[in-house]
From Swiss-Prot:
A molecular function GO annotation: ubiquinol-cytochrome-c reductase activity
Organism of this sequence: Dipodomys deserti
Pfam families: Cytochrom_B_C, Cytochrome_B
Binding site for heme b b566: 97, 196
Localization: Mitochondrion inner membrane
Protein name, entry field: Cytochrome b
Amino acid sequence: MTIMRKTHPLMKMVNHAFIDLPTPSNISGWWNFGSLLGLCLVIQIVSGLFLAMHYTPDTLTAFSSVTHICRDVNYGWLIRYMHANGASLFFICLYLHIGRGIYYGSYSYMETWNVGIILLFLVMATAFMGYVLPWGQMSFWGATVITNLLSAIPYIGADLVEWIWGGFSVDKATLNRFFAFHFILPFIIAAMAMVHLLFLHETGSNNPLGIPSDCDKIPFHPYYTTKDFLGLVILLALFFTLVLFFPDLLGDPDNYSPANPLNTPPHIKPEWYFLFAYAILRSIPNKLGGVIALVLSILILALLPHIQTASQRSLMFRPISQFLFWLLVSDVLVLTWIGGQPVEPPFIIIGQIASLTYFTIILALMPIAGIIENKMLKW
């Protein structure tokens, strides 16, 4: 008698992806983040759906509707804080997932890596539009400043900004379309995640050694389902600690004031997970130059497979590259800190040095380190 999961058309797909999937026997906890990102996406879609039932995308009532959710809807405060902090959790997992991909050379799987970069852009766009919806001070001014960056594009910039706004300023039309896009994009992200998995399962997973592991594979279930479940429990414990004890830790107090176009906050800044890119944007005095640097700070990930010079894939046995990797991590943390500081000395020069260091490490130092390590290993 054949097992149903191996014959039923739908079950067979699930079986090949999550049960009988041949997996390297030595992958570590760093490979947990893919499934954790899936969990984050489910949390965001479910909590967002319930919020959308009570939210009104109108400039006059948006702020009040969020207040109504927190005060009058059963467990509305919990759903709202789960959604707000779920975004932070999503980005923590996302950045750790990307960091693992860089450290262990997973970018060698070009299709999977490129789909991952598209996913990153989609998640960032979704998060930005979601931040605008509560219609607080930082929502309004963040939307105004970030959308205004498009005016730096030569010739079509000004028209493009007005087209996105749906008028001559951020107003009801902008809020309405941002809500529509914010609602649909997570489902597009879910579809793209399936494509991401499809490409990954074409090649099989990488492993910490960065060597082929076809001769030593084990089934995904029960070994990695239990391992992923442990990661899931830890993640949920951290998540609910944040939601129930420190719900406003990662938010901005300015967003508790209703949007007022006549009163500019002293320091306009995006959510913490965009601060590193925001710091790079601000470190260049020229508007167009800043926008190009902002886009390149993410798009530079697509260059990694093309500027790889080392013969070894993983950084596990490459001490010089390891040092540069952790220097890059430290640099991103410095940029995140600078992005949250006012534009005044000494933060300006620190931001400029950190931005230059970011691009130098990725574009110059890491490829040079790869060549030196090849020479040292006589490869």
